[in-house]
């Protein structure tokens, strides 16, 4: 067989707005996977990390693949399951982009180098590809170029939002510090005056 890698996409855990994990302070795998996982069957390279923490999921002994709590092959079905309850979904950012913008779903701040969707094409080396198959491969790669660019823009927006939130928190802390100093300095003379009386 000849195998041609096509693309890689970062995967994100996502939940509905108002989900208990949105307000959680910790987002470890252990914390996230307390909730049912909704996704397609996951390959062994992900299963070795998710298998021990994913409640009600099981690892296939022969393939090493992970069958999640709720296995679905359609993103629309996975999204609906996540929106209807407390399940956690797993998908690439390009699939979630619109829902993130409208704030219907929330991405959980968990990243790992192994949390990637990788796919490719395979065919028999001995048999030459038909012109239709070659055309399909060319068009698929062109679509992927567009998707990769969209994904990079969406990631940049996410990083920008995180930075804005961090700087806003810093500014709020910095603004609160002088007020706290002034309050301390005004209470100190008052205490001294009381002790003199």
Label each residue range with its predicted role.
Residues 4, 30, 79-80, 134:
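Alpha-helical segments flanking ligand/cofactor-binding loops in enzyme cores
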Residues 152-197:
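Polybasic, lysine-enriched low-complexity intrinsically disordered terminal tails
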Residues 43-108:
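Hydrophobic hinge/microswitch elements
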Residues 2-5, 28-30, 60-62, 97, ...:
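Short secondary-structure boundary/capping segments
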Residues 21, 27-29, 35-62, 129-133, ...:
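Secondary-structure junction motif
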Residues 1-11, 15, 83, 106-108:
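Short beta-strand-centered segments that line the small-molecule binding cleft or hinge
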Residues 14-20, 118-129:
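A bilobed periplasmic-binding-protein/Venus flytrap-type ligand-binding module shared by bacterial periplasmic
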């Amino acid at each position: 067989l000849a195998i041609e890698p096509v693309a890689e996409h970062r995967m994100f855990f996502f939940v509905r707005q108002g989900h208990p994990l949105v307000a959680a302070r910790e987002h470890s795998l252990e914390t996230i996977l307390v909730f049912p996982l909704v996704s397609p069957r996951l390959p062994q390279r992900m299963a070795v990390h998710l298998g021990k923490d994913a409640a009600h999921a099981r690892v296939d002994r022969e393939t090493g693949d992970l069958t999640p709590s709720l296995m679905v092959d359609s993103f629309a079905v996975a999204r609906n399951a996540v929106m209807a309850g407390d399940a956690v979904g797993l998908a690439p950012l390009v699939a979630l982009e619109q829902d993130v913008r409208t704030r219907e779903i929330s991405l959980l701040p968990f990243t790992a180098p192994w949390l990637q969707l990788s796919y490719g094409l395979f065919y028999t080396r001995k048999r030459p590809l038909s012109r239709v198959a070659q055309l399909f491969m060319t068009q698929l790669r062109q679509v992927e170029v567009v998707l990769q660019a969209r994904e990079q823009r969406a990631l940049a927006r996410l990083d920008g939002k995180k930075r804005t939130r961090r700087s806003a928190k810093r500014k709020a802390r910095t603004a609160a510090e002088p007020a706290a100093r002034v309050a301390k300095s005004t209470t100190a003379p008052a205490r001294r005056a009381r002790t003199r009386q």
